[in-house]
């Protein structure tokens, strides 16, 4: 497939890298007003351009990774030169209905929420679409399944998916940073503490994904009566570990909804 990404910021570039590294037979073009920061993508075979219309007529999927205020300007630029395209939008707050109205009935709107782990083939990309666009949306699902997982969700949960899957990357990194800081306090240099903390989180996630079980069941395997693990867990909960994370996620969602 030919994939055209408009918006070569962190997210757009991450998607391009992921497609280049983890999928086969796909040609990628990325556009950005200033391409200096994404020229390195050319080393992966990605075409880089300042022109949003460059190669767009050959595109099977057009991905929008731009700011909400840029949508109308970008669409006014590209719509006159394209026909019957699948347009996948990662624009926060832009509903499928709104996008479909903007692009017209000859195009198919799909809503996506990837994250920057796309470049490592480890994104959780939530996807929503109208039933009438199911066939076109399947192309998008197949593409993003190559960059991690691509669960199909109800569009009403897309704002929540933004927080859980996209903002969630930052929340997970904040936990790793805190674990690293604790590692330094108990004797490790920061590099070793970071390596141990990151690998431990990766291992925990792999166990969950492979065994498809509840986290508490895996926690039970690690904890022993009167052991150090349960003592640490209880101390963290005493100071609001779980509740503070839940509050943070809910606060982020409120920010999106205004």
Regions found by a protein language model. Name each.
Residues 4-6, 23, 48-50, 55-58, ...:
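Non-catalytic terminal and connector segments of soluble metabolic enzymes
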Residues 109, 158-163, 215-219:
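Short pre-catalytic strand/loop immediately N-terminal to key active-site residues, enriched for Gly-Thr
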Residues 98-108, 124-160, 172-210, 255:
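Internal alpha-helical scaffold of NAD(P)-dependent oxidoreductase catalytic cores
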Residues 198-258:
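NAD(P)-dependent Rossmann-like dehydrogenase/reductase catalytic/cofactor-binding core
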Residues 15, 35-39, 44, 50-125:
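Rossmann-like NAD(P)(H) cofactor-binding subdomain of soluble oxidoreductases
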Residues 28, 38, 55, 71, ...:
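Small-residue helix-packing motif on alpha-helices
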Residues 1-50, 122, 184-185:
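NAD(P)+-binding Rossmann beta1-loop-alpha1 motif at the extreme N-terminus of oxidoreductases
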């Amino acid at each position: 497939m030919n994939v055209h990404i408009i918006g070569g910021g962190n997210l757009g570039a991450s998607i391009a890298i992921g497609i280049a590294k983890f999928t086969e037979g796909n040609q990628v073009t990325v556009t950005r007003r200033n391409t200096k920061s994404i020229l390195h993508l050319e080393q992966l075979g990605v075409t880089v351009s300042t022109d949003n219309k460059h190669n767009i007529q050959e595109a099977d999927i057009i991905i929008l990774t731009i700011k909400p205020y840029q949508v109308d300007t970008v669409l006014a630029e590209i719509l006159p030169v394209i026909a019957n395209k699948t347009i996948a939008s990662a624009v926060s707050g832009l509903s499928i209905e709104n996008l479909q109205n903007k692009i017209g009935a000859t195009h198919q709107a799909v809503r996506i929420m990837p994250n920057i782990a796309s470049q490592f083939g480890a994104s959780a990309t939530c996807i929503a679409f109208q039933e009438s666009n199911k066939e076109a949306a399947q192309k998008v699902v197949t593409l993003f399944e190559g960059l991690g997982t691509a669960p199909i969700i109800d569009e009403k949960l897309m704002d929540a998916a933004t927080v859980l899957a996209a903002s969630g990357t930052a929340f997970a990194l904040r936990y790793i940073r805190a674990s690293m800081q604790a590692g330094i306090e108990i004797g490790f240099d920061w590099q070793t503490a970071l390596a141990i903390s990151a690998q431990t989180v990766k291992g925990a996630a792999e166990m969950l994904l492979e065994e498809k079980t509840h986290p508490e069941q895996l926690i039970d395997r690690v904890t022993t009566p009167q052991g150090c693990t349960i003592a640490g867990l209880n101390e963290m909960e005493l100071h609001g570990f779980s509740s503070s994370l839940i509050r943070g996620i809910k606060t982020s969602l409120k920010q999106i909804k205004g």
